[in-house]
Amino acid sequence: MLRCLYHWHRPVLNRRWSRLCLPKQYLFTMKLQSPEFQSLFTEGLKSLTELFVKENHELRIAGGAVRDLLNGVKPQDIDFATTATPTQMKEMFQSAGIRMINNRGEKHGTITARLHEENFEITTLRIDVTTDGRHAEVEFTTDWQKDAERRDLTINSMFLGFDGTLFDYFNGYEDLKNKKVRFVGHAKQRIQEDYLRILRYFRFYGRIVDKPGDHDPETLEAIAENAKGLAGISGERIWVELKKILVGNHVNHLIHLIYDLDVAPYIGLPANASLEEFDKVSKNVDGFSPKPVTLLASLFKVQDDVTKLDLRLKIAKEEKNLGLFIVKNRKDLIKATDSSDPLKPYQDFIIDSREPDATTRVCELLKYQGEHCLLKEMQQWSIPPFPVSGHDIRKVGISSGKEIGALLQQLREQWKKSGYQMEKDELLSYIKKT
């Protein structure tokens, strides 16, 4: 059964706040009783909710987990919000003999409790007192609407009670049904509170919207006006969001938008990017689960572009190496169309590389090039062991280390030419012939 209720809310002004409380005419509520919601009630969660009821503190599911449940998806991570302060939560958990972990979140109002081998992250309701585009000074509150106001998008501003009651202050449920991504209140204001919200908008657009192209003009204008604010955001935070954009839906549309709105230079992307190459590669990799750097490499013309990206975003070493590899080899290491075995150049590269991630890199390159048949073959291919060692060569009477090294290299080339078929005896007999 679905029940909807509406409640009148009056706008509130507090001079200490950095912004005006957003006026919201109605609070929309409904009952959710889906299998995904019911599956959340583990022994740990039951114990947690019982404790909060006993201590007269409100506790609700918050943010992304609510969005997922409304979409019929069981959330992987659940954030909880409460009217209890961190001090009250600590006293409550200590009295109940419940262990608390990860105390680093306490200064932000988050306490992590461990019940029945599960961790529960619970954050006190907050209002932003001041913001600087990166961080916020917060004050605790017991007002659920005020906490909802400080969140980025309407679809992330909802709460869910444990009786299944949805609390929606800013039409998040309606936006979710209509596949609409909107900021809570004014886009410009939300963005200026934390400029990373520009990338979060793009990320959730790729996640929520069915067909690309429908954006509020006010939102795009606010992004373009405030894109330079991303220059002050740490590279690590930007990379987390950008990676999710690259592996999400509508990536072609979103990357073009990032360039059209002049966001690119502030997040480490090259000004002279090859968007035509990006368009081609985005089609090549569609449906083949590329790594984020694989698609991103199509924007880079030279390896130095990868190095500059790393300086800005502090990407992982293996990600940087993959980007350098693709930019270097996307044209040089290509299938030999006149060869009876077009996979051979790629296999030879892996054999010569002797690096543990060489096969992964080559598979990503094949995705980039759109060589889907070769990719399937490569994924089924196992690297054959080279059958000759330095010890084998010593047995035939050669003791010089330098000579042994040179012979091993010659034998490896012969073995490669044979399609990795020559066996030890054949290779050792080759030494005697030479």
Swiss-Prot record:
Record annotation: effect of changing M158V: In SIFD; loss of CCA tRNA nucleotidyltransferase activity
Function: Nucleotidyltransferase that catalyzes the addition and repair of the essential 3'-terminal CCA sequence in tRNAs, which is necessary for the attachment of amino acids to the 3' terminus of tRNA molecules, using CTP and ATP as substrates. tRNA 3'-terminal CCA addition is required both for tRNA processing and repair. Promotes tRNA repair and recycling downstream of the ribosome-associated quality control (RQC) pathway by mediating addition of the tRNA 3'-terminal CCA following cleavage by ANKZF1 and repair by ELAC1.
Catalytic activity, as annotated: a tRNA precursor + 2 CTP + ATP = a tRNA with a 3' CCA end + 3 diphosphate; a tRNA with a 3' CCA end + 2 CTP + ATP = a tRNA with a 3' CCACCA end + 3 diphosphate
Residue positions binding ATP: G64, R67, R151, D194, R197, R200, R203
Cofactor(s) named in the record: Mg(2+)
Organism: Homo sapiens
EC number(s) reported in the record: 2.7.7.72
Identification of the protein by name: CCA tRNA nucleotidyltransferase 1, mitochondrial
